[in-house]
Structures are given as structure tokens and as C-alpha cells.
């Protein structure tokens, strides 16, 4: 930038200075100016060289017992050559470029097979396959279980095994299902004690035919059950009671007919009512609102 001090003085009446864009260099003063220290931490700046300060008296109370190790080190001047890097064996010789580690530079030579270390690979026990060797077992071999163990026993089988271990045997009633298509037995209200002991058959011991889903959707099993219930009801009712009920019903019907038609010899034969008239008579007796 050229010096325009003369132009500014001659043309100050025409152009206003742009102070926000540039500033004129101020003339340096030749008076000595006290520069601030490079660091505000005592002991790291040029205070040790200042002749106006009494060093023993000023530094007497610098380091205190309550100061941390970092503050004590900073007050004593810090670690020497903290920000300098010295390559090994080159401190007394000519300066050498910064030595980078081998893992950082791709130009470095890869280690040979003799220098390589075999990495130690650790695999979980359940992922390692080992062939069974009976010679190494010696009676103390335990089969390894997988990470997930499934219990396939039902609660009834487990309870039965526990009772056998305690030598307490409970005799359960036999499960005789009348309907082979159903897995459970119907609970009857007449025998509550027996129904408590009845248990459904085991899923593995099912000998009946598999469920026919087309028959299940079309309510075929329901119709079979209704037919079986009806047949059982017919078997329970005795045949003698049916005959007595039928004879009583016939006698009652005959007595009702005799009471309704009394004997009258004087009535002519033509006065007998025809069946058509008997059929039409109830329609005449019905009120007009119901017609």
C-alpha cells in the first residue's frame, strides 16, 4: 500500500477518510514500553531476570502445600523441553526430520514372517467342536450343553419323577375318553372328586386319528357329539316307561272324544257336521282385527 499521507492532506476537503476500511500507520514512539510477560503463571516468564523484584522474598510463598503437583511444577518453571522432539541418538548431531512410527507410514517395510507374532484367538466353548474320545473321558466326561437348553417334559411328568424319587406313589385314574377326536375329558358336576384327578392325555401319547380341519370347520365334530349325547339319553330312558306313557296318552284322548260328542238319537243324520264346517268354524270365531 503506497503512502498517501500527502494526498490526504491536500485533498482532505474533498474526500472523507475511510477509517472503517484502513488506518494510517502511527509513527512509532522511541520511548521504551514495558511489554507484558509471555505467561501469567509466575516462574514461566522473564520475572527471574527482572532486577526490580526481590526474588527470594517474592518466591518464598509461591509454592504452597495446598497446591497440586501440576501447579507446583508450573511454579518451578515447568518441565524442560516439553514441546521439543528429539530423535534417539541425534541430540548432538545435525537436526533430523521428525521420525514417524512404523504403523503410521504405508511406505514402511512390512514385518517378515519371523517377526510376526501369532495372534491368540479365543472362541467361546459352545462354538468349539471337539470329537468325543472315550480314552480321555475316564468316567468324568460331561457333555457340554448349548447356550439354550429346552425342557421337553410336561409338569405332570416332572411331578411324577419327583414323587418317585421321594418314594410316594399316587395312583391316577385311567383316562378313557369317549370321543377320540378330543384331547380332554368332559368334566361332570356329579363327580367333583373324580374330575379333580382327571388329567388330559400327554401330547406324545396320542393314538387317535389326526384332526380333520375340513370337518372341524364345517362343525362335523359338533354334530357327532350331539348325536352321541342323544343316543346316550335314549339308552338311559327305559323302554317300559315309554310304553306306559303311550298307553296313558291314548286313553286320555279317547275320554276327551267321548265327553265332547254326547249321544243324541233324535238328531237327524243330515245334521251331522262336515269336516269342512269344522275347519271353517275357528275362522268365524276369530275377531276381525286378526283377519
UniProtKB/Swiss-Prot annotation:
Tree of life domain: Eukaryota
Residues found modified as Phosphoserine: 50
Stretches with biased composition (Basic and acidic residues): 221-237
InterPro entries assigned: DUF5524
Pfam families referenced in this protein's UniProt entry, alphabetically: DUF5524
Entry keyword Nucleus: no
Bias (Polar residues) ranges: 176-186, 205-217, 280-291
UniProt keyword annotation of Cell membrane present: no
UniProt keyword annotations, A-Z: Phosphoprotein
Region ranges (Disordered): 29-50, 168-291
Protein name from the UniProt record: Uncharacterized protein C7orf57 homolog
Species of origin: Mus musculus (Mouse)
Amino acid at each position: 500500500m503506497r503512502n498517501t499521507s500527502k494526498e490526504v492532506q491536500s485533498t482532505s476537503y474533498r474526500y472523507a477518510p475511510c477509517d472503517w476500511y484502513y488506518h494510517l500507520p502511527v509513527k512509532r514512539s522511541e520511548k521504551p514500553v514495558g511489554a507484558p510477560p509471555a505467561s501469567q503463571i509466575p516462574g514461566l516468564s522473564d520475572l527471574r531476570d527482572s532486577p526490580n523484584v526481590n526474588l527470594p522474598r517474592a518466591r518464598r510463598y509461591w509454592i504452597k502445600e495446598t497446591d497440586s503437583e501440576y501447579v507446583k511444577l508450573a511454579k518451578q518453571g515447568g518441565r524442560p523441553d516439553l514441546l521439543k522432539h528429539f530423535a534417539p541418538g541425534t541430540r548432538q548431531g545435525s537436526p533430523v526430520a521428525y521420525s514417524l512410527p512404523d504403523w503410521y507410514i504405508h511406505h514402511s517395510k512390512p514385518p517378515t514372517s519371523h517377526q510376526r507374532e501369532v495372534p491368540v484367538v479365543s472362541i467361546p466353548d459352545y462354538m468349539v467342536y471337539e470329537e468325543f474320545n472315550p480314552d480321555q473321558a475316564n468316567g468324568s466326561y460331561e457333555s457340554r450343553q448349548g447356550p439354550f437348553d429346552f425342557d421337553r417334559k410336561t409338569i405332570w411328568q416332572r411331578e411324577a419323577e419327583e414323587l418317585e424319587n421321594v418314594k410316594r406313589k399316587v395312583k391316577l385314574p385311567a383316562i378313557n375318553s369317549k370321543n377320540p377326536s378330543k384331547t380332554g375329558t368332559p368334566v361332570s358336576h356329579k363327580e367333583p372328586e373324580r374330575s379333580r384327578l382327571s388329567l388330559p392325555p400327554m401330547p406324545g401319547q396320542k393314538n387317535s386319528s389326526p384332526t380333520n380341519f375340513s370337518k372341524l370347520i364345517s362343525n362335523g365334530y359338533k354334530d357327532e357329539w350331539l348325536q352321541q349325547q342323544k343316543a346316550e339319553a335314549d339308552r338311559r330312558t327305559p323302554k317300559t316307561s315309554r310304553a306306559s306313557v303311550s298307553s296313558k296318552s291314548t286313553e286320555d284322548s279317547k275320554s276327551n272324544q267321548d265327553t265332547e260328542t254326547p249321544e243324541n238319537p233324535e238328531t237327524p243324520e243330515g245334521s251331522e257336521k262336515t269336516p269342512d264346517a269344522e275347519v271353517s268354524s275357528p275362522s268365524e270365531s276369530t275377531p276381525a282385527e286378526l283377519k
